[in-house]
From Swiss-Prot:
Domain of life: Bacteria
Keyword DNA-binding: no
Name under which the protein is recorded: Elongation factor G
Bridged cysteine pairs (disulfide): none
GO molecular function, one term: GTPase activity
Cellular localization per UniProt: Cytoplasm
A Pfam family matched in the record: EFG_C
Chain's gene name: fusA
Amino acid sequence: MARKTPISLYRNIGISAHIDAGKTTTTERILFYTGLTHKLGEVHDGAATTDYMEQEQERGITITSAAVTSYWSGMAKQFPEHRFNIIDTPGHVDFTVEVERSMRVLDGAVMVYCAVGGVQPQSETVWRQANKYQVPRLAFVNKMDRQGANFFRVVEQMKTRLRANPVPIVIPVGAEDNFSGVVDLLKMKSIIWNEADKGTTFTYGDIPAELVETAEEWRQNMIEAAAEASEELMDKYLGGDELTEEEIVGALRQRTLAGEIQPMLCGSAFKNKGVQRMLDAVVELLPAPTDIPPVQGVNPNTEEADSRQASDEEKFSALAFKMLNDKYVGQLTFIRVYSGVVKSGDTVLNSVKGTRERIGRLVQMTAADRTEIEEVRAGDIAAAIGLKDVTTGETLCAESAPIILERMEFPEPVIHIAVEPKTKADQEKMGIALNRLAKEDPSFRVRTDEESGQTIISGMGELHLEIIVDRMKREFGVEANIGAPQVAYRETIRKAVKAEYKHAKQSGGKGQYGHVVIEMEPMEPGGEGYEFIDEIKGGVIPREFIPSVDKGIRDTLPNGIVAGYPVVDVRIRLVFGSYHDVDSSQLAFELAASQAFKEGMRQASPALLEPIMAVEVETPEEYMGDVMGDLNRRRGVVLGMDDDGIGGKKVRAEVPLAEMFGYSTDLRSATQGRATYSMEFKKYSEAPAHIAAAVTEARKG
């Protein structure tokens, strides 16, 4: 099968925003204008196409990023047909892992901001992630029809809060109830969309008299930004020559791809205005797969760096970036193909696990429908059915040319909840459900507590785990009771000590003998967490038993002596010991090492560590005192305060996770729902003595 759409006409884009900026409505309009959906789905009535999981519809927030394929030839059909793969990314802080994962497979992004609320704390998190993956982006200021809408204020906020370099290429005509369209600064004409056909057609008009001066000013700003792309253009501009529309677009594109500027547009998705011009900007200014650098990876056989060009001729390579369970076909694995071609029925290599996988069927998704396809080519995104053992973030590639694309790193979960099935019948189903969900979401973990036998689930926040429990119920029919959230404490040591243990048993026949002397010392926090150094001289412990000493200590790390939490940030030096020709064994040295470690830990002034969260609260000024007082009561340390640019304050603080449970409810009631907050894990630090005592008591109780 030949390629239908040239790779240069592909656009893999993410629509990214904080909650309530109107991202789902924006995505919905994109799908409408690109000819996919005929009835416009509104989030307000729970019918949006990309929010295809039931709970997303209930909560009105987008949780799983669906990859949707659609086509666009321009508002005035001025372009050849382009193929868009739109990846909808979640905007809630508990889902930042999902956002990171989407960023990894995007080529470009559209950041959606609310014309009233502007740049929110969550927007900053997403911006940082886009910087990390060097994603070129446009900004779309939505909700221009709302009371208090102000496009130019958002331009300023992008500069001050995101340290961005926004370059408006349109400006609004009117605002709030009078918002009627935009001025296109390239053509210097107004664009008014036809309300009768929901904005499918439009007319160019003259710029309203009161806007001519403002439009001139912003056009100059845009041309200056374009001229900086090259010396030639700068000379032409400074020489007083007009730059052509083509030159301006080409220069803006060049600088957008380099991450130097972020073109800005505006509109109201709800009122069907502005999204169409933004789609044209995606074609004009965001990258095709061939515009971004070749994807980097590592050859698993040689561990040497390797890369793949975005070309059908290259060997096949793809990244699995999302798992979904589908009622009808089972597991769907979304893959981004970076190079080569893969056909249904092909056998490929999972280079991370070193296993072979057969691609059963391939489907391309529109938000809730799917089309079977025979093959996927470089630069495209599709879902594979029938993969047996592939997890998010793993690479699929041709067996003849193995490569591991970037290993994605996921943060450690910070919150645990015990779950128990309501009935015996639910027990087995719950195990299957949790394992499937863990496969979809690497930031979610499942384990069994050895002492209590309870199933413990861990995740990135309360909402994250609430949604997991909710999905178990809906998708797998498992009813479960959940315990109170628990904090992922850790233990460590505060001083260096020397410890020794001799394990000697004689009980008729072969005895057991292992003797180790270790030195323990605290390590820099946040590093590897554990380091083992063999300093045995003169063979006092034979070589073959050294790994057993390491293993004995490693096996003891998960259960510390303060309150049974995992031990971190310790360095162990094995300095001396002895052995017995007959009675020494690997097991004897494991046991000796384990006991020596426990003994050493008791002497090394052990401490309990608790997770500290970076918390940002945006609040109207009149609630400032209450918010600060509440954070102090929660043992928070306020690091600073800024104006949020819209008459309120932004408070930055570090607060122990243990004190943050139920915070969203408390904050809502204290500020009549007007304050918002975001939090992410920052670091572990030592818990105060009274907290450590209470935690220890609770564990032993």
